Design a protein with these regions (language model features):
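Helical element adjacent to the flavin cofactor pocket in flavoenzyme catalytic cores
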Residues: 56-110, 114
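A short, surface-exposed helix-loop junction/capping segment
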Residues: 50-56
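Active-site substrate-recognition segment that forms the wall
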Residues: 5-6, 114-199
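Short, well-ordered beta-strand micro-motif
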Residues: 14-16, 58, 139-141
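Dinucleotide-binding Rossmann-like beta1-alpha1 core, especially the glycine-rich loop
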Residues: 1-48
Length: 199
């Protein structure tokens, strides 16, 4: 229906930092629930910009979802179908019945709340012992990195093309704002420099 691609297959390699991590990788890859997803053969990454004293574990069936592109295209589709409403949800207007829910003039069988850490404001879920975390990422440019795969270490690095890479992510349990921070930028730059030599 949307006539475009959002899911891109790309290999993911987990940087293993010592013998113990390699042994843990072998143990995990032998488990029946994980064996289809974790390669039992460790890989060498032939990339001078990525320094590692040990091999990498390859995760199978990996890629990334371009969520921004998906959201934009799907929103446009729903608008064209007259099925999209953008407003602040008013919980007091939600009526739950045995066989349906009603919200203003909308009737449906089910409702899905996709609110992230906003669930604390949702009267149906604010009693759950869940706490949101804020994650930040950077887009960097590196002509020397030349990655065609995702690298996962203390951070992850995702190639975007044209020498651009997404680097992430931070985890902040205190700051719940939508604003980027210099603290997160510094953390990501330092981890990127330590985990990989980005020339």
């Amino acid at each position: 229906k949307l006539d475009t691609t959002f899911l891109f297959e790309i290999p993911l390699f987990r940087k293993l930092n010592n013998i113990e991590e390699q042994n843990n990788w072998f143990s995990a890859s032998d488990k029946p629930a994980l064996s289809n997803y974790l390669s039992s053969e460790l890989k060498t990454l032939n990339n001078e910009a990525v320094v590692s004293n040990y091999k990498f574990g390859k995760v199978n069936e990996t890629g990334f979802l371009d969520t921004k592109k998906l959201k934009e295209n799907y929103t446009n589709y729903l608008v064209a179908e007259n099925c999209y409403l953008e407003e602040t949800f008013d919980y007091s207007k939600l009526v739950i019945q045995d066989d349906q829910i009603e919200y203003k003039d909308i009737r449906a069988k089910q409702i899905v709340f996709a609110e992230g850490f906003g669930l604390h404001n949702n009267p149906y879920f604010n009693n759950l012992p869940l706490d949101g975390t804020k994650g930040e990422l950077l887009i960097i440019k590196s002509e020397n990195l030349k990655l065609n795969e995702i690298i996962n270490s203390s951070i992850w690095i995702l190639p975007l093309g044209n020498h651009l890479y997404k680097v992430g992510a931070t985890y902040d349990w205190e700051d719940k704002t939508n604003q980027t921070t210099e603290k997160a930028k510094t953390e990501l730059v330092e981890k990127a420099a330590k985990a990989q030599e980005l020339a």
